[in-house]
């Protein structure tokens, strides 16, 4: 009833926006899309849902917190759904709007459409990424962000041992180790989600950690580590195995 009291003659739509990069915790409450749909239908106004980061795969089956998928929103009755082309979707930076044809057609006629539309290169890149989603297995395998967040801790640990061995064999002026850590997803939809992971640690002998971190960030292929307890942490979940030897070579220039 509280939501309906806000509807006036000039109300043209109901908009539900994902909190995206933050969460309000404690004694709080938020209206759901299921509650808004009948209100919108009763007053004959469209409902728009901004999902933040576009999620096309139910990530809860991989042990992550459930996030509403684009398909869920459409299935429940949202008239227009908008979301990002990058972030969890894994494509180029873009805004995507889907929904009922009559509303999409109105947007196409708006004068701002020409100014805000993406270029052909972005459209081509986005098309290739979306084609991966024709097979969930293929998307998980080929899109880096999905592959990283769904990789098992055992597999991450196995790769961490490999990176540790490569760095040790590079004879760096540092102590190389391994420690459990947590990967934080963020990405516009999962700001509080943390995944158990494994980090390779570097304790330099002849250079301070802040100085080493700075020089790592200025390499030709920047390495962005996490620092704590006078130690460099490389979260292996976020590193492709094909870069392990390159990382060892570049660190060899600094240590």
Residue ranges and their predicted role:
Residues 3-4, 8-133, 168, 250:
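Conserved PLP-enzyme active-site core in the AAT-like
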Residues 5, 122-123, 127-186:
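Conserved PLP-dependent catalytic core of the aminotransferase class-I/II
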Residues 14, 95, 198-200, 234:
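Well-ordered beta-strand positions enriched in small/hydrophobic/aromatic, beta-favoring residues
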Residues 53, 102-108, 135-145, 191-196, ...:
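Short acidic (Asp/Glu) and glycine-rich catalytic loops that position anionic groups and cofactors
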Residues 61-65, 154-155, 189-193, 238-244:
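Short glycine/threonine-rich loop-to-helix capping motif typified by GTGT followed
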Residues 88, 151, 232:
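Glycine-rich phosphate/diphosphate-binding loops and the adjacent beta-loop-alpha structural elements
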């Amino acid at each position: 009833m509280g939501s309906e009291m806000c509807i006036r003659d000039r109300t043209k739509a109901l908009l539900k926006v994902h909190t995206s990069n933050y969460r309000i915790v404690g004694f709080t409450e938020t209206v759901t899309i299921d509650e808004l749909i009948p209100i919108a239908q009763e007053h004959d106004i469209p409902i728009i849902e901004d999902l933040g980061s576009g999620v096309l795969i139910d990530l809860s089956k991989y042990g992550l917190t459930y996030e509403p998928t684009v398909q869920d929103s459409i299935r429940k009755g949202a008239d227009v759904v908008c979301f990002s082309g990058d972030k969890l979707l894994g494509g180029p930076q873009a805004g995507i709007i889907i929904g009922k044809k009559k509303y999409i057609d109105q947007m196409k006629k708006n004068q701002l459409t020409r100014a805000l539309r993406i270029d052909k290169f972005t459209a081509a890149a986005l098309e290739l990424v979306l084609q991966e989603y024709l097979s969930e297995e293929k998307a998980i395998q080929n899109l880096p962000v999905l592959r990283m967040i769904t990789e098992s801790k055992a597999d991450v640990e196995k790769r961490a041992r490999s990176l540790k061995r490569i760095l040790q064999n590079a004879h760096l002026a540092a102590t190389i180790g391994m420690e459990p850590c947590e990967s934080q997803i963020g990405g516009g939809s999962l700001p509080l989600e943390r995944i158990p992971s494994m980090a390779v640690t570097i304790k330099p002998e002849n250079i301070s950690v802040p100085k080493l971190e700075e020089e790592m960030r200025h390499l030709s292929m920047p390495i962005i580590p996490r620092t704590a307890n006078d130690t460099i942490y490389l979260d292996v979940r976020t590193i492709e195995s094909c870069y392990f030897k390159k990382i060892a070579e570049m660190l060899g220039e600094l240590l």
